[in-house]
Amino acid sequence: MASLLSPSMPVLAAVALTLTLAVIPEASTNAEAKQVVLGGVEPADPKDKEVQKVVKFAVRTYNDMDNDLYLSKPIRLMSASQQVVAGKNYYLKIELGRTTCTKTESNLVDCPFNEQPDQQKRVICNFQINVAPWLNKMSMTNFNCYNF
């Protein structure tokens, strides 16, 4: 009975491969096709609303964890990338500056940067933020900052 099934195995393998190539265009050998790396890190658009939400979350969390009496706010978003996982990981590099607002003040938008030479503080931080939209949850999974 095994000999009856043996000739059909190569046929089944060929059919499976053909269906896979037909259903997944990225698996084709077309040189112009975009290379897709599942789970790979890709650039994120800094102007995207989701990226802006993640930046605000990262800065708010940084301010909550930082021992400084004053709030910091973004000077510039240096880079942003994303990775599809169980949800999405965002990797952000943000330059932050100390403001004149203390942590008891809540409106960071209106806080000017502290320009007094002895009070200026600038840091560059790398943040990793995980977003699980089905749980309505963001969490900072890693970060490090350095003065410059």
From Swiss-Prot:
Induction: By high phosphate diet. One of its GO terms (molecular function) is cysteine-type endopeptidase inhibitor activity. Residues 36-148 form the Cystatin kininogen-type domain. Disulfide bonds join 101-111, 125-145. Its main location: cytoplasm. In cartilage, expressed mainly in mature chondrocytes including prehypertrophic and hypertrophic cells (at protein level). Expressed exclusively in cartilage. Keywords: Biomineralization, Cytoplasm, Disulfide bond, Signal. Transmembrane segments: none annotated. Residues 1-33 form the signal peptide. Belongs to the cystatin family. This is Cystatin-D. The lineage of its organism: Eukaryota, Metazoa, Chordata, Craniata, Vertebrata.
